From Swiss-Prot:
Gene of this entry: rimO
Sequence positions that bind [4Fe-4S] cluster 1: 16, 50, 82
Record-linked InterPro entries: Elp3/MiaA/NifB-like_rSAM, Methylthiotransferase, Methylthiotransferase_CS, Methylthiotransferase_N, Methylthiotransferase_N_sf, Ribosomal_uS12_MeSTrfase_RimO, rSAM, rSAM_horseshoe
SMART domains, sorted: Elp3
Name listed for the protein in its UniProt record: Ribosomal protein uS12 methylthiotransferase RimO
């Protein structure tokens, strides 16, 4: 379908990087629109929502209501994604300001929905393939690649399988074709993502799917650097850690949300793993040269007692994660933990405050360990008038930190790409660095 080129589109992509990939697929279908950040001037306002936890749901709803208030006469307001999917039976009545609702199954049909001005909810969850055109946002050198959708885990607190369905892995060849296509356009750094990346190809009867992917990307030699997000402990193996360590392309980056360390809490959370398995994996990751380890913790899950929390706190202080996300338990419908007796909010807040102090201490230590050492980094774009924005190659975009390079020290402008840099100052959670050379 051809769309008039003078029409403007305002896209607001909420939530995770997996959501962003779906947003980029929709942009690929709406390529003839002119993108704008001004919702008031847009002919179409497209909000790709998040429905993971309560705070994300509230952000999505408020964003929709703000857009409804701002939109001009005749403009179309669309709410797509997880919130729409999760509450598709009631959301049309709850938010009548929206013109079109669609869930997680029809991102590649967004142009048709706009043309017909109709809602659409397909049963099958959409999984982006190499033939789905995407308009990559935010970088000219980095892209996300989604390797699977859905999840077969049965965590007590997580509603994702209820609206994203069972694990659905892409074919390896499709991923390789997408990587090749993006690399030819200059995207030489990629982050591979899924709800449960380490279970890639489990649904096709293959337990070493992620190892196969790493090996194939290494042989393809289309990329300079890559990393994997969202390893699940029970499907992560020492062999997988070894494959990442030995890869010339995949960075020694380990993002494995453990959620807790106490055996009794892991059982209550239905994590299908144990403290011993967690420790075996984490110790192996720490033994990898120049490894970078990120994790996620949930505080205040029903029935978390003081002893279990103290065990978690002591472990986090001892292990010293490079980065740590700490979430308060969010009671979600259609989960096992929803009806269990809750930990008081006051207790949860106090526990989070204590863990945040530990996390910040070790995060700062991780930053300072880079000072006055040459590191490999990706320079992505200009940050304001005087600085270039960069990140350590081991870091994931947006979440792990920021490095700024002062352009006054440069003889020629920097092009986005791979450079060796030396951080020299750490202040306000930002590293300042100088460039040595490209590589």
């Amino acid at each position: 379908m051809q769309i008039k080129e003078n029409k403007q589109l305002c896209l607001i992509s909420l939530g995770c990087s997996k959501n962003l990939v779906d947003s980029e697929v929709m942009l690929g279908k709406l390529y003839n629109y002119t993108l704008t950040n001004d919702a008031k001037s847009a002919d179409v306002i497209l909000i790709n929502t998040c429905g993971f936890i309560e705070s994300a749901k509230q952000e999505s709803i408020q964003t929709i209501l703000n857009a409804a208030k701002d939109k001009k006469r005749g403009a179309i307001l669309i709410a797509s994604g997880c919130l729409s999917e999760r509450y598709k039976d009631e959301i049309k009545e709850l938010i009548p300001e929206v013109d079109i609702f669609t869930g997680v199954g029809d991102y590649d049909k967004i142009d048709i929905m706009i043309a017909k001005k109709q809602n659409q909810f397909s049963e099958q969850v959409f999984l982006s393939e190499h033939y789905n055109a995407r308009i990559i946002t935010g970088s000219s050198v980095h892209a996300y690649v989604k390797i699977s959708e859905g999840c077969n885990q049965k965590c007590s607190f997580c509603a994702i399988p209820s609206f994203k369905g069972k694990l659905q892995s892409r074919e390896l060849n499709s991923i390789l074709k997408e990587v090749e296509n993006l690399a030819l356009k200059g995207y030489k750094d990629m982050t591979f993502i899924a709800q449960d990346s380490s279970s890639f190809l489990y649904d096709k009867g293959q337990k070493d799917g992620l190892i196969q992917l790493i090996s194939a990307i290494d042989k393809q030699q289309a990329l300079k650097s890559a990393r994997i997000l969202y390893l699940y402990p029970s499907s992560t193996t020492l062999e997988l850690i070894g494959a990442i360590e030995s890869s010339p392309i995949f960075q020694n980056y380990f993002d494995m949300p453990i959620q807790h360390i106490s055996d009794s809490m892991l059982k209550k959370m239905r994590r299908n793993s144990s403290q011993a398995h967690h420790l075996k994996l984490l110790d192996a990751m720490k033994q990898v040269k120049e490894s970078f380890i990120r994790s996620t913790i949930i505080v205040g899950h029903p029935e978390e007692n003081e002893g279990e929390f103290e065990e978690l706190s002591a472990f986090l202080d001892e292990f010293q994660f490079d980065r740590l996300n700490i979430f308060a338990f969010s009671a979600e419908e259609n989960t096992h933990a929803y009806s269990l007796e809750k930990v008081p909010k006051k207790t949860i807040n106090a526990r989070i405050k204590a863990l945040n102090k530990i996390a910040l201490k070790h995060q700062n230590h991780s930053f300072k360990a880079l000072l006055n050492k040459p590191i490999k980094a990706l320079v992505e774009n200009k940050e304001g008038e005087y600085f270039y924005k960069a990140r350590d190659l081991r870091w994931a975009p947006e979440v792990d930190g920021e490095i700024l390079i002062n352009d006054s020290a440069l003889t020629t402008p920097l092009q986005p790409g791979h450079y060796t840099i030396v951080p020299s100052v750490f202040k306000d959670n930002i590293l300042l660095a100088k460039v040595l050379s490209p590589f």
